[in-house]
Every structure is written in structure tokens, then in C-alpha cells.
Amino acid sequence: MMTETIRGDDLEQYRYCARCGEHLTQKLLDGRVRPVCLSCGNVVYLNPLPAVAAVLIQNGRVLLIRRGVDPGAGLWALPSGFMEQGETPESAICREVFEETGIKCSPGKLISATTHDDHVFGHVLVLAYSVACEIRDATAVAGDDAVEAHWYDTTSLPCLAFDTHRDIIRQAEVLYSMEHHEIL
């Protein structure tokens, strides 16, 4: 049976029970060390944070943003971010693309569901979708936590903030070529 190791700093943030306020104890449950309240029995499950990443490819170029904040400040990334309470992945994708590029879009197909261990946010579940611009050849204008937006040739990508984004772009290219029976 495979178990994941949880970083000590992940467990350290859970010192008191959210239900009763008593101190939490680290206990091995189901093959994992988990914060547990011995007073009321509450178990804290350390679940991944859901995030979305958008892949807009037009004419062999992919839309990237230069991040203005950590993690990865100054590096390039797909338009992406965390889902908000009450959002679907599809609505989160459209919101993130608009906030970071000013482009209105509609969600396409799910390209990938992968995980990423981030030094700031911990374990992140990344849902990547293809998206279609509502206006062909739309001009991207950086906004929100993006300081720049640019279309890059998929064969010459800049240094990306997240390895998962490079993998997602490659997966999108493969799916596109399979759907259109062509080699990119």
C-alpha cells in the first residue's frame, strides 16, 4: 500500500480543532499521519486545493502570462488560478482567462487532471482545459496578477513557472493533432 509523506509544515498549521478548540494530536490513520482531536474525534483531512489552467492555442501559438506574484513571479505560465467557492471548473477557467488577459472565452475539453506540489500552497489539483476565444485573434491585455500577456510559438516556449504547464501544453498539442489528423 502506497502512502504519501506530508510535510511537517503542512501539519504544523493545524494546532487547534476547528470544532471544539482543543489541541490536535498527530495520529497515524489509514496509513497517513493526520491531525486528530482526541477530545471530539474530529480528523483534519489535508485535501489538495483545486486550480484551473487554460490552454488557448491559435495558429500554432499558445497564450501565456508573465506572473506578477509568487509562486513563479516573473516567469511565464498558462492563464491559471484557484477555483473560488461555488464555481465550476469551467466558470473558473473563463474568469481566470478574463482576469489575466482581458479575453472572453468559452471552455472546451478537459485536457488533463494532474497534481502539483507547490512550496506556497501545498498540494494542488490542476484541471487544464482548452478554451476558445470569443473573438478570433483577440488581443491579450495583462491584468490581475499577470504583468504581461503574450502569444508564444509552441515550439519555442519561454521559461515556465510550472513544469506541469509545459506538460499540459504538450498534451493539448497531441489532442489537437489527433482531432485534426495532423502533426504539429
Per-segment meaning from a language model:
Residues I6-A53:
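Acidic, metal-coordinating catalytic segment for phosphate/diphosphate chemistry
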Residues S39-L63, F82, A113:
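Conserved N-terminal beta-strand and adjoining loop/helix that marks the start
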